[in-house]
């Protein structure tokens, strides 16, 4: 078709432009998008790409636009620079089938009926007579309203672009199902260094592992970025208090010791009441009111010249299908992080739990190669917190999983799944090519060492440990795992009957325990507009006064 140059005379209420091309035509369609938007005209793109015919999305003023399509496909693409081959012309029968499908969707749209082209694209394959519906979510730095929830999973336009099962490695429990999620690369379309992969695990059920991987991908996606329209205040606590702005008192936070701050080369400054920093609005579930919190607790973004006070707290970031579910899961992480850190840094010799039959059956095929220790982590909130230590006898690698759940046995299963799943991460870190790929995403990882002596690569005070992956790399060093593993042997026994229980997995149940000890529950909503459009919520939950497992703690 020829390119429209002028729509100034068009009757916007009764005009719909259908733009058809026999190639991807992204530049032409982008130009047309601007023209139609400027004149308030609705339009429908129709193009061929990879031998398929792609119709949609149906574009109306104030809604989805073609820039969303370009951004989503660019971020999700695995072959960013691949040229699209020129497809053969459609035969008469194929063309009739395509036009009949497009006409049906077009008529539905114009008559106000339900059709997939109002929320995304339809990809038509004349050879197979199939139709694939692809969502086009809003791009977070260009927020817009959406008419209905859309999927966030799609290999061409999604946030999650792929899901695949990771088969069990030799010596790993066959009953543990592990799923890897591939995530769109938002660096291609905006200033957003999001994680490109996430892993989820579950016992027996791959659907649960798949959902765990999606949840992990979504929470990392939202947790790596603050939207440009997010209100951020740059001030000190004292200034905010002076103007009556409710804010979290820095003196309530437990970050680093005075000794660590004095350590030569330590990259962080202590946060004082007169320290200027960025603040974002959160919500206190304890008071029921808004409260401003230091932005660095939940985001890596800083203003020019802003001091560094800490990396974002690794515990507390979670997703859910409701805001309450996200906060509940985040609170479980925060409650697990506190006793975990106190145990890990102080290394008291705690008791161990006997392996119950229900768990022994899950790991029966790993008994020769792995040593499993379950440790209850007592805490002042009397919630079930379990650490699962998994020691690989052959590779001399130790992994640790932690979990809080209303029931101690469920917490143990969750922690054990995490502990075993981490060995997949270790294998990637211990592979020269795998590590090279990870270092492109996580620049603070050290270069590959065939001798695995990574303790020699990091500073003695671990001031250069800036990411949980750095901790995992250190644990590849047989000396690191060996030191801790020795502390896990010959522990006194403790009965399961002695452990606390919560009764139900609800926010109020946890919140009551936390507040009874004088602590406050705060959450910061980090849900991006595209994730919200897919029906998910992401929050970072904080409990001031608890210790979080900071990489350098």
Question: What residue ranges belong to the model's regions?
Answer:
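A short, well-structured beta->alpha microelement
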Residues: 1-15, 27
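Short secondary-structure boundary/capping segments within folded domains
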Residues: 9-10, 34, 168-172
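Short, well-ordered coil/turn elements that cap or connect secondary structure elements
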Residues: 12, 38, 60, 367-369, ...
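E1/E1-like adenylate-forming module used to activate ubiquitin-like modifiers
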Residues: 15-101, 108-111
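Hydrophobic structural packing positions in well-ordered secondary structure
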Residues: 36, 103-106, 326, 411
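Helix-biased "structured C-terminal domain" signature
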Residues: 114-553
